[in-house]
Design a protein with these regions (language model features):
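Thiamine diphosphate
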Residues: 1-69, 78-99, 240
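Hydrophobic alpha-helical context, especially transmembrane and signal-peptide helices
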Residues: 3, 12, 75, 86, ...
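Homeobox/homeodomain signature
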Residues: 16, 31, 54-57, 75, ...
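Short, conserved catalytic or adaptor-binding loops enriched in Gly and charged residues
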Residues: 66-73, 301-304
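Short glycine-enriched loop/turn motifs at secondary-structure junctions
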Residues: 73-74, 215
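Flexible, low-complexity linker and terminal segments
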Residues: 91, 96-346
Length: 346
């Protein structure tokens, strides 16, 4: 299915392939091909419980790290996660536009909650802008190359088979800007540099996400995907009782929008709520040297060097607002106790 989608896109018609975590693993080599050849590809990963056959009909958010880092070599791609069923409808349109504009792979992470759930929303009025543009058959300017990377953005014109002057080879091997296979020193480095620049160029188009609640406080709860509703309901309940808690939900997970570090720095503690595995820090064998964090928490700690904690499970069930609210209360209470202890020590 992934190969068919790549072939369709190469011919000028962007296509999507839909799978779950194990299916995505089987598509690893083809995803790498789409990245290397810079062929637009949209892949939807409907996450479910793992590992192996795991919980094939239950919910999980365990594929984030494997989607970002799972291919051999450097394979920059856009990763996004809709939060509602309505969001899924619009996200796939957005994903296609991103894939075609930046000649890249876009992975849309959904999960079993979104795949099997129901949500009423107003039927959208058809917008012609949602459709892919007609296949470009205009002549290629003389001297243009299939990978004529722009020095600032890494972007290059997309050649479509049949365009006069556009004949070229397509390959998954390291190649020059003229699509010629090459092993000279620096060729692969140059290609990797420009493909990474495309991700940076796309990141410049993203808006900083909005904090749900006050922009500063004691606790910031961060999440992604289908957990948004439960998190925001829990925040509403806690804030109604005077707790200084807020939440921030991320739609784009690779790359992340600018301004996130500044948001996190305005809170005393940052914690992620996720449906994937993390170690229980209370266990006697778990230390800071060996603790495994939930997927998003791991990314935040690595990228922003913040002391982000996590609260997650792999029960195969949606996380309930009441459980999140209870966790918030416990974390805020722990913060207050720490502040009191610090004052006493002084």
């Amino acid at each position: 299915a992934c190969a068919f989608a790549i072939g369709s896109s190469y011919a000028g018609k962007c296509a999507v392939t839909i799978t779950s975590g194990p299916g995505k693993a089987l598509k690893t080599e083809l995803i790498g091909l789409a990245v290397m050849a810079e062929i637009p590809l949209v892949l939807v990963d409907v996450q479910r419980g793992g590992p192996s056959t795991g919980l094939p009909t239950k919910v999980e958010q365990g594929d984030l790290l494997s989607v970002i880092f799972g291919e051999p070599g450097d394979t920059p791609k856009v990763v996004m996660a809709p939060a509602t069923i309505e969001d899924c409808f619009y996200s796939i349109i957005t994903a296609r536009k991103i894939a075609e504009t930046f000649r890249t792979v876009v992975v849309v992470l959904t999960d079993a909650n979104l795949a099997t759930g129901q949500q009423p929303f107003t039927r959208p009025k058809f917008n012609p802008a949602w459709l892919a543009p007609p296949i470009d058959q205009s002549p290629i300017p003389e001297g243009a190359k299939p990978y004529d990377w722009h020095p600032k953005t890494g972007l290059s014109r997309r050649f479509i088979p049949g365009q006069p002057g556009g004949m070229h080879t397509i390959t998954g091997l390291a190649h020059t800007n003229n699509a010629k296979v090459a092993y000279e020193p620096g060729v692969n480095q140059e290609g990797c540099d420009f493909r990474s620049l495309k991700l940076a160029a796309f990141q410049k188009t993203l808006k900083t996400p909005t904090v749900y609640g006050d922009p500063e406080g004691d606790l910031l709860v961060m999440g992604w995907g289908s957990t948004r509703g439960a998190i925001e309901e829990a925040v509403d309940r806690a804030r109604a009782d005077g707790l200084r808690v807020s939440s921030l939900h991320l739609k784009f997970l690779q790359p992340m929008a600018s301004g996130l570090k500044e948001i996190m720095q305005k809170f005393k503690k940052v914690i992620t709520v996720e449906i994937n595995y993390s170690d229980d820090p209370r266990h006697e064998m778990i230390t800071e040297d060996n603790r495994r964090y939930a997927n998003l928490a791991w990314l935040l700690r690595a990228r922003y060097l913040v002391d982000a904690d996590c609260w997650s499970n792999v029960h195969g069930q949606p996380i309930k607002p009441g459980a999140i609210e209870q966790m918030m209360r416990e974390r805020v209470a722990a913060l207050k106790e720490t502040e009191i202890d610090t004052l006493i020590e002084r």
